[in-house]
Amino acid sequence: TGLTQKTPALLANEIARCRDMTDQPFGVNLTFLPAVNPPDYPGYVKAIIDGGVKAVETAGNNPQKWLPALKDAGIKVIHKCTSVRHALKAEAIGCDAVSVDGFECGGHPGEDDIPNFILLPRAAEELRVPFVASGGMADGRSLVAALALGAEGMNMGTRFMATKEAPIHDNVKQALVAASELDTRL
């Protein structure tokens, strides 16, 4: 997530580090939040473009303002949405794809609290752009379920918190691995 880096320069360093680890394409998430003193969004967008990133997952506020610069750089834009109406708006403004986040997601689940078993089929009925399922996805079984519900793929987020690459304290990682289905709080 781009905003976990305190400055665009730090994001550029992380993009370069990722580039050193793979010759495959990768994406960056950039969340646009309402703020009295917003982050340096133009700088973050420039770091993404200059870093040769191939895909950006935007989240939060409407990304329309940033689409021309990103698309002119050949970057695919996937907007994260927690409702079908927001997904349709993302499609209408020109996003290439949508990440449909059910209530099960580890981040902000939106205001409507719609679980994936309801949200994904509705998105499949309405959207013309590809979409991936997000929220509660963890393995191949999740992928099969997401595909059956109409998505073209899935996002995993929390699942990767326990990896050696994640800059998270080992106690937190161990707690995640040891957790049962009863330890999730929505």
Predicted regions and their residues:
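Active-site entrance/lid segments in N-terminal catalytic domains of soluble metabolic enzymes
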Residues: 1-127
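Conserved active-site-proximal phosphate/metal-binding subdomains
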Residues: 110-132, 138-186
